[in-house]
Amino acid sequence: MKKIDRSSKVRTGFHQAKWDEPVIFELSKHGERGILVNKADPKVAEAVEGVSALPEFLKRKEAPALPEISQPRVLRHYARLAQETLGADVNIEIGQGTCTVKYSPKVNDQLANLPQMREMHPLQDESTCQGIMEIMYNTGKYMCEISGMDRFSFQPSGGSQGILGMASLVYAYYKSRGEEKQRNEIITTIYSHPSDAAAPHVKGFKIIYLHPDENGYPDYEAFKAAVNEHTAAFFVANPEDTGVYNKNVLKFTKLVHEAGGLCAYDQANANGLLGVTRARDAGFDMCFFNLHKTFSTPHGCGGPACGAVGCTKELEKFLPAPLISFDGEKYYYDYETTNNPAAIGKIREFNGVAPVVLKAYAWIR
């Protein structure tokens, strides 16, 4: 079969539609509706006080500024906007920042939108959530196999929050050893994601930036000079945002470990490495994956995110609570594993974005 060269047709030769499309608020017509909401059942209305139970300061003084618009008009509006965009459905090679974006199977969106998933509530009793808890537990097992780590948390809801989770693990580890004041420096490279510096800075660490050598790799001699008794951890994306993979990364992680530090792997650029190498094999103590990049769930404005954080057995007790465990008969929210004064507690409410984990599970399977 003849290979089709789409580069000139899609990227440089792309001709987008041009619509003089108003913003959706300008399409609003008073009294127009896209859906008619049923009135509450009398028994429900009687049992629930509704607005009258709200304190006065929470009650609106006027109606919200929402467009009044029919379904066909909404459909045409967003279809026209989509025609003006070179999106992932038109060309999978589209770049979003430094991201390598996978195809997000549409069937997975349908799966996540099933009533059994969509209508669940995070405060349900765990006995009624065994299905999704099993999926989250097993997805964590898959992540461990892919990365070489021992335990994962899906609580962080994005890449930067995943890096913040790793920075929190680093701080918790040294706090448990009484070394949090001494170990106050994080080394990262200038071509790693900016969050690899920003998130540890939020946790109070001093950031040491590493520049590349003449070959584009992180400068190892400069790295050796930077590592000392104050080094808490090495945070790095590999490959970096230049697309260059540091084949000598094991030398870097070994040096940090010899100095008593930890190594954290930003795997936002992991698409090209799956099945080739693993974070643990490269000497890292923790890592995170963007499920919304590497495991096919929609990225950016296409949907919610998850920055899954994994770590070694030694660091497991510091992970966000609760974890999900299995006792041989049922899955349960595990607060005991992380029940220690140094544990980082919560990164966000509840246990992460469950539909994102479900989509990643389906893609892996």
Regions found by a protein language model. Give the residues of each.
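N-terminal glycine-rich, Lys/His-bearing helix-loop that initiates the first secondary-structure elements
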Residues: M1-E119
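Short, hydrophobic/aliphatic alpha-helical segments
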Residues: V74-V90, T139-M149, F289, Y332-P341
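Short acidic-aromatic active-site loops that bind/stabilize oxyanions
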Residues: P67-Q71, D125-Y137, P156, S160, ...
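Short loop-beta-helix segment that forms the pyridoxal 5′-phosphate
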Residues: T128, K141-S168
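Structural motif of enzymes handling amino- and sulfur-group chemistry
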Residues: Y332-R365
